[in-house]
């Protein structure tokens, strides 16, 4: 952020996702770096306050250090855009597409980008979930990666 017209920076960190600890660490590192570069830094943690309490009159730009659900999936970005506040991060649609593994997978396949075989288990199927049958039916084999559809930071 070399543009000094963005002097007052709000670092949004923490949140309520399973990646809260990662977000807090990222946010703290950002705060330290911004202060060192002489930016006026304030913080906001959506775990304790709703995003609608952001006072846009007191900030020039939002540094989005949220990780996971609501931070990387387009939710926070859409609210920042609603407030008409510039922010760091990809936009709403890009964030959603990147965070949702099924959407990403579909985009890769449609654009002929090589990607490993996969199988998605939906909540309704969990009762009857039989890994051995799925492996045989889908011709999958170990090693496997099992992850939630919309979390990052290697949670899963």
Pin down the residues of each PLM region:
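Hydrophobic residues within alpha-helices
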Residues: 26-30, 76, 104
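Conserved dinucleotide-binding and phosphotransfer motif residues
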Residues: 37, 83, 111
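Glycine- and acidic-residue-enriched helix-capping/strand-helix junction motifs
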Residues: 16-29, 33
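Active-site nucleotide/adenylate-binding loops and adjacent lid/helix of ATP-dependent enzymes
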Residues: 1-13, 25, 41, 56, ...
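Eukaryote-biased intrinsically disordered, low-complexity acidic regions enriched in Ser/Thr/Pro
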Residues: 42-56
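Hydrophobic alpha-helical packing residues
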Residues: 34-35, 80, 108
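A short, GP-enriched loop/loop-strand-helix hinge that lies immediately N-terminal to
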Residues: 6, 15-19, 58-99, 114-123
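A generic structural motif
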Residues: 36-42
């Amino acid at each position: 952020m070399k543009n000094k017209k963005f002097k007052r920076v709000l670092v949004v960190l923490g949140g309520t996702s399973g990646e809260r600890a990662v977000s807090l660490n990222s946010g703290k590192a950002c705060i330290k770096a911004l202060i060192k570069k002489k930016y006026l830094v304030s913080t906001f943690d959506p775990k304790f306050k709703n995003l609608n309490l952001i006072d846009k009159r007191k900030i020039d730009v939002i540094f989005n250090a949220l990780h996971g659900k609501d931070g990387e999936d387009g939710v926070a970005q859409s609210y920042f855009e609603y407030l008409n506040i510039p922010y760091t991060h990809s936009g709403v649609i890009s964030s959603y597409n990147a965070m949702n593994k099924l959407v990403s997978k579909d985009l890769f396949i449609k654009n002929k980008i090589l990607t490993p075989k996969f199988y998605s288990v939906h909540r309704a199927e969990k009762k009857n979930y039989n890994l051995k049958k799925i492996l045989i039916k889908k011709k999958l084999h170990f090693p496997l990666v099992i992850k939630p559809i919309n979390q990052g930071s290697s949670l899963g």
